[in-house]
Swiss-Prot record:
GO terms for biological process: potassium ion transmembrane transport. It catalyses: K(+)(out) + ATP + H2O = K(+)(in) + ADP + phosphate + H(+). It is a multi-pass membrane protein. Belongs to the cation transport ATPase (P-type) (TC 3.A.3) family. Type IA subfamily. This is Potassium-transporting ATPase ATP-binding subunit. It is an enzyme of class 7 (translocase). Keywords: ATP-binding, Cell membrane, Ion transport, Magnesium, Membrane, Metal-binding, Nucleotide-binding, Phosphoprotein, Potassium, Potassium transport, Translocase, Transmembrane, Transmembrane helix, Transport. It comes from Streptomyces coelicolor (strain ATCC BAA-471 / A3(2) / M145). Its main location: membrane. It holds the Pfam family E1-E2_ATPase. It is found in: Cell membrane. Residues 1-11 have a biased composition (Basic and acidic residues). Part of the high-affinity ATP-driven potassium transport (or Kdp) system, which catalyzes the hydrolysis of ATP coupled with the electrogenic transport of potassium into the cytoplasm. This subunit is responsible for energy coupling to the transport system and for the release of the potassium ions to the cytoplasm. GO terms for molecular function: ATP binding; ATP hydrolysis activity; magnesium ion binding; P-type potassium transmembrane transporter activity.
Length: 707
């Protein structure tokens, strides 16, 4: 066993409160709470966002939203016409509310971005100017480091850049990144080697190989992303913008044909009235909130300590149809514990325990450590260390061999998956035993994990027995998988366990399918097979061997505790390193898509009421029959037009909290979800304007000269 690692973990356990493995939230925080909490409409946040809302009046910024750009142009036109007639209070009032419509839209986006900027400020405080000490003893500013440089970091040093530990082990304070106050272990080799620039070494000494250029570190990328500087419109967002622009062009052409009709009917349509009609008919509600919805979706992930590298990844999460979930840490608690030693006939428990402990001395996994501890506690075997075995050759575990062990003192000991160990024994002229097969089947059928232990010595190669590792399925997982099934999402458990063990745990947890004895190649093949069937796939990973699959998956969530290669390959990073959070990520993605669809439905539906308000007001005097369309009984043409414009602006402000918070998400099928949204937001979009415009008309009609 690596004594340095054990020493650090023992020291940490005495100074930090114990936590269950993979808690859903960092210590001291509630689940779902990120580094920076922010209310939807805190007064300070609104005040800070107002200057940004005015700055966004720049036509170059407004042009990114075709619908709101038309409203901006309309506001300028109505203001220009009102200037020519200073006494026209109707024109000035319309102009004022059109400007408010634009400002409300900008304010929604500014508030959404403001939450990200608050998080960026927190991250900036984590960035400090550092002086790096190279391995050769020379010093250089942190900004002068290049990829491949080796730097030495000791207790109290701030790590100058992103990299991998190539020598040593240390505890590191990553609270500036994750919000987690408890230090973490970073060591060379394995999947805990990645370190982040701006974090602080608390103890001992490590040598770090720099893997990123200055300005491209993890913190730099986080700042750019949460501030929105690197945010690009997603394909769905672009498609919706094209649809909204097309509707705007159609209504623009329709309004352009009205003046000739008015002239033919012997009446005149004022430009201010035409602009008001156009603004009320085009889908301003969703046009105003579309950008804020996308920004808020990424913000909800950040609040849960998940960093999405692009909005495309968040959308893909909402469309995922297959979830690949690692068993350990995601479905089970993660730390399997050795429960018993089951020797074959002719072998004593003490002999099996001795061999199992010996083969586990170099095994730094919780399972390996538990074998060493069980042998010590149950059979009185003293805890040995690697250094005691002079000339020993330690065989590390790999995903291909699926076993580990040691060659020392004239014998070879192996421990690992049953199939791999039996194959190793047979290659050396030995054979498996019926006792071992029976024990493997019994343990697997009970949902445990059997590890076979074998030895080759002067008596030949033979199986000694089985180590029983117990797995515990996390509470509530079956209910979560039932929810995913109702949403039409297929779940697949990925495990290196044998098929019997995998099936027992899959049945207990309630997943749809499982992939047993999985290698990285098997995982990649499964992803490609699912994608070939037109499905979007999401998965988690933390090791370098996960990198190809993370890059291939539509949603690849890398653990922050993982390797640099894994974090580079994924399109999301979970700062809490909680694999179970993948299910939450999918729910947030679906909530984003549902919110966008619901508000689009509402926006298009409420145009109907505005039509019944304005068209009769324009032509009822010339065509009395149109007065029948005035089903709201609006008091006058001017009042009808003004009421529609006021409602059009206020509804944006009313819906901003919904756009930022998201429509309430309930796990259900796509058909039921569609019917519900059409009922709530389609019908609501029809009814709300009739009520709102009528109430505003009652107030407006009291204004002299309009009512």
């Amino acid at each position: 066993m690596n004594t340095d690692t054990q020493k650090h973990e023992d020291a940490m356990s005495t100074t930090t409160p114990a936590r269950a493995p993979h808690d859903d939230a960092p210590s001291g925080q509630q689940p779902g709470q990120g580094r920076v909490g922010a209310g939807l409409f805190e007064p300070k946040q609104l005040v800070k966002s107002l200057p940004d809302a005015f700055r966004k009046l720049d036509p170059r910024v407004m042009a990114k939203s075709p619908v709101m750009f038309v409203v901006l142009v309309g506001s300028v036109l109505t203001t220009a016409f009102s200037v020519t007639e200073p006494g026209d209070w109707f024109g000035w009032t319309i102009s004022a509310w059109l400007w408010l419509t634009v400002l409300f839209a900008n304010l929604a986006e500014a508030v959404a971005e403001g939450r990200g900027k608050a998080q960026a400020d927190t991250l900036r405080r984590a960035k400090t100017d550092t002086v790096a000490r190279r391995a050769d003893g020379t010093t250089v500013p942190g900004t002068g480091l290049t990829v491949g440089d080796l730097v030495v970091c000791e207790a109290g040093d701030v790590i100058p850049g992103d990299g991998d530990v190539v020598e040593g082990v240390a505890s590191v304070d990553e609270s500036a990144i994750t919000g987690e106050s408890a230090p973490v272990i970073r060591e060379s080799g394995g999947d805990r080697s990645a370190v982040t620039g701006g974090t602080k070494v608390l103890s001992d000494r490590i040598v770090v190989r720099i893997t990123t250029k200055p300005g491209e570190t993890f913190i730099d990328r986080m700042i750019n992303l949460v501030e929105g500087a690197a945010r690009q419109k997603t394909p769905n967002e672009i498609a919706l913008n094209i649809l909204l622009a097309s509707l705007t062009v159609v209504f623009l052409l329709a309004c352009a044909t009205l003046p000739p009709f008015a002239d033919y009917a012997g009446t005149h349509l004022d430009m201010i009235v035409l602009v008001a009609l156009l603004v009320c008919l085009i889908p301003t509600t969703i046009g105003a909130l579309l950008s804020a919805i996308g920004i808020a979706g990424m913000d909800r992930l950040v609040q849960r300590n998940v960093l999405a590298m692009s909005g495309r990844a968040v959308e893909a999460a909402g469309d995922v149809s297959t979830l690949l979930l690692d068993k350990t840490g995601t479905i089970t608690l993660g730390n399997r514990q050795a429960a018993e030693f089951v020797p074959v006939r002719g072998v004593t428990e003490a002999e099996l325990a001795d061999a199992a402990q010996l083969s586990s001395l170099a095994d730094e996994t919780p399972e390996g450590r538990s074998i060493v501890v069980l042998a010590k506690e149950k059979y009185g075997l003293r805890e040995r260390h690697q250094g005691e075995l002079v000339g020993a050759e330690w065989i590390g575990f790999t995903a291909q061999t699926r076993m580990s062990g040691v060659d020392a003192d004239g014998r070879k000991v192996r421990k690992g998956a049953a199939g791999s160990v039996v194959a190793w024994v047979r290659e050396r002229g030995g054979s498996g035993t019926e006792d071992a097969d029976t024990a493997v089947e019994r343990i697997s059928a009970a949902g445990g994990t059997p590890l076979l232990v074998a030895v080759e010595d002067e008596r030949g190669a033979r199986v000694l027995g089985v180590v029983h590792l117990k797995d515990v399925v996390k509470q509530g997982m079956r209910e979560r998988f039932d929810e995913l099934r109702r949403m039409g999402i297929r779940t697949v458990m990925i495990t290196g366990d044998n098929p019997l063990t995998a099936k027992a745990i899959a049945d207990e947890a309630g997943v749809d399918d499982y992939l047993a004895e999985a290698t990285p190649e098997d995982k990649m093949a499964l992803i490609k097979r699912e994608q070939a069937g037109g499905k979007l796939v999401a998965m988690t990973g933390d090791g370098t061997n996960d990198a190809p699959a993370l890059a291939q998956a539509d949603v690849g969530v890398a653990m922050n505790t993982g390797t640099s290669a894994a974090k580079e390959a994924g399109n999301m990073v979970d700062l809490d390193s909680n694999p179970t959070k993948l299910i939450e990520i999918v729910e947030i993605g679906k909530q984003l898509l549902i919110t966008r669809g619901a508000l689009t439905t509402f926006s298009i539906a409420n145009d109907v009421a505005k039509y019944f308000a304005i068209i009769p007001a324009l032509f009822a005097a010339v065509y009395p029959g149109l007065d029948k369309l005035n089903i709201m009984g609006l008091s006058s043409p001017d009042s009808a037009i003004l009421s529609a414009v006021v409602f059009n602006a206020l509804i944006i402000l009313v819906l901003v909290p919904l756009a930022l918070k998201g429509v309430r998400y309930r796990p259900t099928s796509a058909d039921r979800m569609l019917r519900r949204n059409l009922g709530v937001y389609g019908l609501g979009g029809l009814v709300a304007p009739f009520i709102g415009i009528k109430l505003i008309d009652l107030i407006v009609s009291l204004i002299p000269g309009i009512g």
